[in-house]
Regions:
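N-terminal positively charged amphipathic segments used for targeting/anchoring
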Residues: 1-37, 190-207, 216-253
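N-terminal membrane-targeting segments
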Residues: 2-78
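Periplasmic polypeptide-binding modules associated with outer-membrane biogenesis and secretion
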Residues: 32, 39-53, 72-126
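Solvent-exposed coil/turn segments that connect beta secondary-structure elements
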Residues: 50-52, 97-99, 107-111, 126-129, ...
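Solvent-exposed, non-transmembrane alpha-helical starts
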Residues: 70-74, 112-117, 154-161, 205-208, ...
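Extracytoplasmic segments of membrane-associated envelope/inner-membrane machinery
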Residues: 105-181
Protein backbone atom coordinates (compact mmCIF):
# COMPACT_ATOMS: atom_id res chain seq x y z
CA UNK A 1 0.00 0.00 0.00
CA UNK A 2 2.76 2.40 0.95
CA UNK A 3 4.53 1.68 -2.32
CA UNK A 4 1.36 2.40 -4.29
CA UNK A 5 0.89 5.71 -2.49
CA UNK A 6 4.47 6.66 -3.29
CA UNK A 7 3.92 5.84 -6.97
CA UNK A 8 0.74 7.92 -7.03
CA UNK A 9 2.55 10.85 -5.41
CA UNK A 10 5.36 10.58 -7.95
CA UNK A 11 2.89 10.49 -10.82
CA UNK A 12 1.05 13.52 -9.47
CA UNK A 13 4.35 15.32 -9.01
CA UNK A 14 5.40 14.53 -12.59
CA UNK A 15 1.98 15.57 -13.89
CA UNK A 16 2.16 18.89 -12.03
CA UNK A 17 5.66 19.38 -13.44
CA UNK A 18 4.50 18.77 -17.01
CA UNK A 19 1.47 21.00 -16.50
CA UNK A 20 3.81 23.78 -15.37
CA UNK A 21 6.07 23.18 -18.38
CA UNK A 22 3.05 23.27 -20.69
CA UNK A 23 1.71 26.49 -19.15
CA UNK A 24 5.14 28.13 -19.38
CA UNK A 25 5.46 27.03 -23.02
CA UNK A 26 2.01 28.38 -23.90
CA UNK A 27 2.73 31.68 -22.16
CA UNK A 28 6.11 31.94 -23.90
CA UNK A 29 4.51 31.35 -27.30
CA UNK A 30 1.78 33.88 -26.49
CA UNK A 31 4.37 36.46 -25.45
CA UNK A 32 6.35 35.77 -28.61
CA UNK A 33 3.24 36.23 -30.76
CA UNK A 34 2.41 39.48 -28.95
CA UNK A 35 6.00 40.66 -29.41
CA UNK A 36 5.89 39.87 -33.15
CA UNK A 37 2.53 41.57 -33.62
CA UNK A 38 3.07 44.66 -31.50
CA UNK A 39 6.86 44.81 -31.32
CA UNK A 40 7.30 44.99 -35.11
CA UNK A 41 4.78 47.67 -36.02
CA UNK A 42 5.77 49.20 -39.35
CA UNK A 43 5.85 52.98 -38.99
CA UNK A 44 8.21 54.22 -41.68
CA UNK A 45 9.41 53.13 -45.12
CA UNK A 46 12.50 54.60 -46.76
CA UNK A 47 12.97 54.05 -50.50
CA UNK A 48 15.72 53.66 -53.07
CA UNK A 49 14.06 53.80 -56.50
CA UNK A 50 15.60 53.52 -59.95
CA UNK A 51 13.41 56.03 -61.82
CA UNK A 52 12.35 58.46 -59.12
CA UNK A 53 8.74 58.56 -60.32
CA UNK A 54 7.24 57.99 -56.86
CA UNK A 55 7.93 60.05 -53.75
CA UNK A 56 8.71 58.53 -50.37
CA UNK A 57 5.32 59.72 -49.11
CA UNK A 58 3.50 58.07 -52.01
CA UNK A 59 5.19 54.74 -51.26
CA UNK A 60 4.38 55.03 -47.53
CA UNK A 61 0.74 55.86 -48.32
CA UNK A 62 0.53 52.90 -50.70
CA UNK A 63 2.02 50.49 -48.12
CA UNK A 64 -0.57 51.65 -45.56
CA UNK A 65 -3.34 51.29 -48.13
CA UNK A 66 -2.26 47.68 -48.76
CA UNK A 67 -2.49 46.95 -45.04
CA UNK A 68 1.18 46.00 -44.63
CA UNK A 69 1.72 46.66 -40.94
CA UNK A 70 4.18 44.07 -39.60
CA UNK A 71 7.85 44.83 -40.24
CA UNK A 72 9.14 41.34 -39.49
CA UNK A 73 6.51 39.54 -41.58
CA UNK A 74 7.00 41.93 -44.51
CA UNK A 75 10.77 41.36 -44.40
CA UNK A 76 10.55 37.56 -43.95
CA UNK A 77 8.14 37.13 -46.87
CA UNK A 78 10.48 39.12 -49.11
CA UNK A 79 13.51 37.05 -48.05
CA UNK A 80 11.61 33.80 -48.62
CA UNK A 81 10.68 34.81 -52.18
CA UNK A 82 6.99 35.31 -51.41
CA UNK A 83 6.87 39.10 -51.47
CA UNK A 84 3.62 41.03 -51.29
CA UNK A 85 2.57 42.26 -54.72
CA UNK A 86 3.13 46.01 -54.88
CA UNK A 87 1.61 47.66 -57.97
CA UNK A 88 4.20 50.45 -57.97
CA UNK A 89 7.15 48.11 -58.57
CA UNK A 90 8.33 45.49 -61.02
CA UNK A 91 10.58 43.99 -58.34
CA UNK A 92 11.86 45.02 -54.92
CA UNK A 93 13.86 43.98 -51.87
CA UNK A 94 13.23 44.82 -48.23
CA UNK A 95 15.85 45.66 -45.61
CA UNK A 96 14.73 45.81 -41.98
CA UNK A 97 16.44 48.73 -40.26
CA UNK A 98 14.61 48.41 -36.96
CA UNK A 99 11.39 46.84 -35.64
CA UNK A 100 9.57 49.93 -36.91
CA UNK A 101 11.40 50.84 -40.11
CA UNK A 102 12.34 49.23 -43.45
CA UNK A 103 14.07 50.34 -46.64
CA UNK A 104 12.62 49.26 -49.98
CA UNK A 105 15.01 49.11 -52.94
CA UNK A 106 12.92 48.79 -56.08
CA UNK A 107 12.63 48.79 -59.84
CA UNK A 108 9.63 50.98 -60.54
CA UNK A 109 6.90 50.27 -63.04
CA UNK A 110 7.40 52.70 -65.91
CA UNK A 111 4.55 55.16 -66.14
CA UNK A 112 3.26 55.08 -69.72
CA UNK A 113 1.30 58.30 -69.97
CA UNK A 114 -0.84 60.82 -68.13
CA UNK A 115 -4.27 62.38 -68.44
CA UNK A 116 -4.73 65.96 -67.26
CA UNK A 117 -8.06 66.68 -65.56
CA UNK A 118 -8.53 70.04 -63.83
CA UNK A 119 -4.75 70.49 -63.48
CA UNK A 120 -4.39 67.08 -61.82
CA UNK A 121 -2.09 64.63 -63.61
CA UNK A 122 -3.20 60.99 -63.54
CA UNK A 123 -0.33 58.66 -64.48
CA UNK A 124 -1.03 55.09 -65.59
CA UNK A 125 0.90 51.86 -66.25
CA UNK A 126 0.82 49.37 -69.15
CA UNK A 127 -2.51 47.98 -67.90
CA UNK A 128 -4.22 51.35 -67.62
CA UNK A 129 -4.05 51.36 -63.81
CA UNK A 130 -3.62 54.80 -62.25
CA UNK A 131 -0.43 54.59 -60.15
CA UNK A 132 0.19 58.26 -59.44
CA UNK A 133 -1.95 61.35 -58.95
CA UNK A 134 -0.09 64.64 -58.76
CA UNK A 135 -0.15 68.35 -59.49
CA UNK A 136 3.36 68.03 -60.92
CA UNK A 137 4.25 66.94 -64.44
CA UNK A 138 6.97 64.32 -64.90
CA UNK A 139 9.35 64.93 -67.78
CA UNK A 140 9.49 62.32 -70.53
CA UNK A 141 5.99 60.90 -70.07
CA UNK A 142 3.52 61.59 -72.92
CA UNK A 143 0.30 63.50 -72.44
CA UNK A 144 -2.83 61.60 -73.51
CA UNK A 145 -5.76 63.31 -75.22
CA UNK A 146 -8.97 62.13 -76.85
CA UNK A 147 -9.79 59.46 -74.26
CA UNK A 148 -13.17 60.00 -72.60
CA UNK A 149 -12.90 58.78 -69.01
CA UNK A 150 -15.83 57.96 -66.76
CA UNK A 151 -13.67 57.63 -63.67
CA UNK A 152 -10.02 58.04 -62.67
CA UNK A 153 -9.21 56.55 -59.27
CA UNK A 154 -5.79 55.95 -57.76
CA UNK A 155 -4.71 52.26 -57.98
CA UNK A 156 -7.74 51.41 -60.14
CA UNK A 157 -7.93 50.81 -63.89
CA UNK A 158 -9.17 53.75 -65.92
CA UNK A 159 -12.87 53.58 -66.65
CA UNK A 160 -13.44 54.77 -70.22
CA UNK A 161 -16.45 55.00 -72.53
CA UNK A 162 -14.76 53.11 -75.37
CA UNK A 163 -12.64 50.07 -74.40
CA UNK A 164 -11.18 49.80 -77.91
CA UNK A 165 -9.81 53.32 -77.57
CA UNK A 166 -8.15 52.40 -74.28
CA UNK A 167 -6.67 49.18 -75.65
CA UNK A 168 -5.21 50.94 -78.69
CA UNK A 169 -3.78 53.63 -76.44
CA UNK A 170 -2.12 51.05 -74.16
CA UNK A 171 -0.70 49.20 -77.17
CA UNK A 172 0.91 52.41 -78.41
CA UNK A 173 2.21 53.65 -75.04
CA UNK A 174 3.74 50.26 -74.27
CA UNK A 175 5.27 49.74 -77.72
CA UNK A 176 6.98 53.13 -77.98
CA UNK A 177 9.04 52.38 -74.85
CA UNK A 178 11.37 50.28 -77.01
CA UNK A 179 12.49 53.38 -78.91
CA UNK A 180 14.45 56.43 -77.83
CA UNK A 181 12.37 59.12 -79.50
CA UNK A 182 10.57 61.43 -77.11
CA UNK A 183 6.80 61.39 -77.62
CA UNK A 184 5.21 64.58 -76.32
CA UNK A 185 1.57 63.62 -76.80
CA UNK A 186 -0.64 60.78 -77.98
CA UNK A 187 -4.14 61.49 -79.23
CA UNK A 188 -6.74 58.76 -79.78
CA UNK A 189 -9.95 59.55 -81.65
CA UNK A 190 -13.37 57.90 -81.29
CA UNK A 191 -12.46 55.37 -84.00
CA UNK A 192 -9.51 54.18 -81.87
CA UNK A 193 -6.97 55.71 -84.26
CA UNK A 194 -3.82 56.99 -82.58
CA UNK A 195 -1.61 59.93 -83.48
CA UNK A 196 1.66 60.52 -81.65
CA UNK A 197 3.44 63.86 -81.61
CA UNK A 198 7.23 63.76 -81.82
CA UNK A 199 9.06 67.10 -82.06
CA UNK A 200 7.00 69.04 -84.65
CA UNK A 201 5.68 65.97 -86.46
CA UNK A 202 2.23 64.42 -86.00
CA UNK A 203 2.65 60.71 -86.73
CA UNK A 204 -0.69 59.17 -87.70
CA UNK A 205 -0.50 55.52 -86.62
CA UNK A 206 -4.15 54.71 -87.23
CA UNK A 207 -5.44 51.59 -85.52
CA UNK A 208 -3.17 49.10 -83.79
CA UNK A 209 -2.81 46.68 -86.71
CA UNK A 210 0.87 46.20 -87.71
CA UNK A 211 1.84 48.67 -84.98
CA UNK A 212 5.26 47.12 -84.39
CA UNK A 213 6.25 47.48 -88.05
CA UNK A 214 4.98 51.05 -88.21
CA UNK A 215 7.09 52.00 -85.20
CA UNK A 216 10.16 50.23 -86.61
CA UNK A 217 9.70 52.07 -89.90
CA UNK A 218 9.34 55.39 -88.09
CA UNK A 219 12.45 54.65 -86.07
CA UNK A 220 14.39 54.03 -89.30
CA UNK A 221 13.32 57.38 -90.79
CA UNK A 222 13.36 59.32 -87.51
CA UNK A 223 16.48 61.44 -88.11
CA UNK A 224 15.20 62.64 -91.48
CA UNK A 225 11.57 63.19 -90.51
CA UNK A 226 12.12 65.33 -87.39
CA UNK A 227 13.85 68.00 -89.48
CA UNK A 228 10.40 69.01 -90.68
CA UNK A 229 7.12 70.24 -89.29
CA UNK A 230 4.04 68.46 -90.52
CA UNK A 231 1.99 65.25 -90.59
CA UNK A 232 3.33 61.79 -91.38
CA UNK A 233 0.63 59.40 -92.63
CA UNK A 234 1.32 55.90 -91.28
CA UNK A 235 -2.29 54.77 -90.93
CA UNK A 236 -1.62 51.85 -93.23
CA UNK A 237 1.62 49.90 -93.13
CA UNK A 238 3.97 50.15 -96.12
CA UNK A 239 5.83 47.01 -97.16
CA UNK A 240 8.80 49.00 -98.46
CA UNK A 241 8.82 51.41 -95.50
CA UNK A 242 7.84 54.52 -97.49
CA UNK A 243 5.22 56.94 -96.16
CA UNK A 244 3.88 60.39 -97.02
CA UNK A 245 4.96 63.42 -95.01
CA UNK A 246 2.79 66.47 -95.51
CA UNK A 247 4.81 69.49 -94.45
CA UNK A 248 3.06 72.21 -92.49
CA UNK A 249 3.89 74.86 -95.10
CA UNK A 250 2.36 72.83 -97.94
CA UNK A 251 -0.97 74.27 -99.08
CA UNK A 252 -3.95 71.96 -99.16
CA UNK A 253 -5.13 71.16 -102.65
Amino acid sequence: MKQRRKLKRRRKKKLRKWVKVFIIAVLSIALLVVAVIFGFKLQKVDTKLDLGQFTNKEVNDYIKKEGIENTLWFWLKNKAGHSDKLELFEDYTVKMNSPFKVTITAYEKKLKGYINVNKIYYYFDENGVILKQSTEKIKGIPKITGVECNNLTLYKKMEVKNKKVLQNLLDVTTSIQEYKYNVKRIDVNKDAEATMYVKDVAVQLGKNSNLDKKLRDFNDMYDNVIKYKGTLNMKFVSEDGSYTLKKADEKSK
